[in-house]
Amino acid sequence: MKIVRTIAELRQHLSAYKHPAFVPTMGNLHEGHLSLLRQAKPLGDVLVASIFVNRLQFLPHEDFDTYPRTWEADCQALQAAGCDVLFAPGEQELYPEPQTYRVQPPAELADILEGHFRPGFFVGVSTVVMKLFACVQPRVAVFGQKDYQQLMVIRGMVRQFALPIAVLGVATLRAADGLALSSRNNYLTPLERAEAVHLSQSLQQMAKALRAGTVDIAALEQQAMVDLTARGWQPDYLAARRRADLQVPAADEVAALVQNDGLVLLGAARIGNTRLIDNLEV
């Protein structure tokens, strides 16, 4: 595996290839990341991963400074997963001057759910992904569906800017008890880790209610919030949305959406000091 630190060296090295496959990460890799790499490997003639903790997508009170950085373990894991090129720029390389030009996703997608609770998050994500795409120039890019809204934002960006990149979403990998794999799971205490599965279980209960005929989305979401709060969580949202646009479905379209696999349930909640997200397609 070749490790590259500069954009110039990356472009020079990749000039020998025609179909790069790309998996961007922030490091602290787990089996979920490695599953993305394995999916990406046969899709191109060179497999590129990046490690870059992107300051633009963190709010001032969030965990940019404490986000786990596990360089040696990450390099070993990437090599074992078949990565050919690791692009690991420093902040000065990717942002040599203030990033005053930014990608602004539409408010109806970027200012709801995660975007409501993390203002500016999707501007930061879109901007760094656009910049990484410009550096790598992949033919295919692979992302996890755990970050469901992020995947939709990136797909929309690629479509509207006519980027010649196929964006592939890969199903969320889960622990044996159902907890979605996440770098932030490392923050959990043993007691919190045992409790953490209840976020995915809350979404499963919502799905069960929808399949049983529930059409009152507001009441469904409110009850799920109450139930999770009673367990000691601080939920930001537990939401049922249309898969197509992440908007709230009208009561008279819920049944048809459930029947035609047209809904997604999304949740974000804090247990202790750790904020977790998850989703479930219905």
UniProtKB/Swiss-Prot annotation:
Pfam families: Pantoate_ligase (PF02569). GO terms for cellular component: cytosol. GO terms for biological process: pantothenate biosynthetic process. Coiled coil: none annotated. It is found in: Cytoplasm. (R)-pantoate binds at residues 57, 150. PANTHER family: CYTIDYLATE KINASE/PANTOATE-BETA-ALANINE LIGASE (PTHR21299), PANTOATE--BETA-ALANINE LIGASE (PTHR21299:SF1). Catalyzes the condensation of pantoate with beta-alanine in an ATP-dependent reaction via a pantoyl-adenylate intermediate. The reaction proceeds by a bi uni uni bi ping pong mechanism. NCBIfam families: cyt_tran_rel (TIGR00125), panC (TIGR00018). This is Pantothenate synthetase. The gene is panC.
